[in-house]
């Protein structure tokens, strides 16, 4: 199994010689071997896509958001670092971004992993901060009685 390693490439170069736009890094502890879910969107409204990672299968529902502008200079500035569900769950958490409220910031939508039901939770970008868990804008069970998790996107 893979670890929580992130690499980002210039999409125009993928058909020939892939060009990295940021240096590789581990979103979570290197000892984890369950991979991660990733998405990108401008949650802080600075015009750069930020990188959002969610714990992979077998991991906790941890969400990490890193400032995209800083990543381009290989610096890691946390925009958020919180658990988006039951901290005891080990199904990971799926992540997506979408503008839910029409402002200039992307908003975060997360889906529970396998074994944690089928919860979908949304957080407004304006409520996401580097410390603490943001207040949920919405939270619902997408498939009542289903325990296999839910992909969002």
Where are these regions (language model features)?
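Acidic/hydrophobic-patterned starts of short beta strands in beta-sheet-rich repeat architectures
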Residues: 1, 45-55, 102-112
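Repetitive beta-architecture junctions, highlighting loop-to-beta-strand starts
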Residues: 2-6, 20, 34-36, 49, ...
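Repeat-based blade/solenoid architectures
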Residues: 4, 25-40, 81-97, 139-153
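Beta-propeller blade repeat segments, especially FG-GAP/WD-type strand-to-loop junctions
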Residues: 5-24, 62-81, 119-138
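Functionally constrained cores in energy, signaling, and assembly domains
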Residues: 8, 51-53, 65, 85, ...
């Amino acid at each position: 199994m893979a670890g929580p390693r992130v690499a980002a490439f210039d999409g125009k170069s993928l058909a020939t010689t892939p060009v990295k736009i940021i240096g590789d890094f581990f979103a979570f502890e290197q000892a984890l071997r369950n991979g991660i879910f990733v998405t990108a969107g401008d949650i802080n409204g600075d015009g750069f896509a930020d990188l959002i990672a969610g714990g992979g299968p077998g991991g906790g529902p941890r969400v990490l958001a890193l400032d995209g502008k800083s990543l381009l200079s290989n610096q890691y500035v946390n925009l958020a670092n919180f658990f988006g569900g039951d901290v005891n769950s080990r199904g990971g958490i799926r992540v997506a971004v979408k503008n839910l409220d029409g402002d200039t910031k992307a908003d975060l939508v997360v889906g529970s992993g396998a074994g944690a039901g089928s919860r979908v939770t949304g957080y407004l970008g304006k409520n996401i901060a580097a410390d603490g868990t943001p207040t949920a804008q919405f939270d619902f069970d997408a498939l009542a009685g289903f325990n296999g998790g839910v992909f969002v996107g």
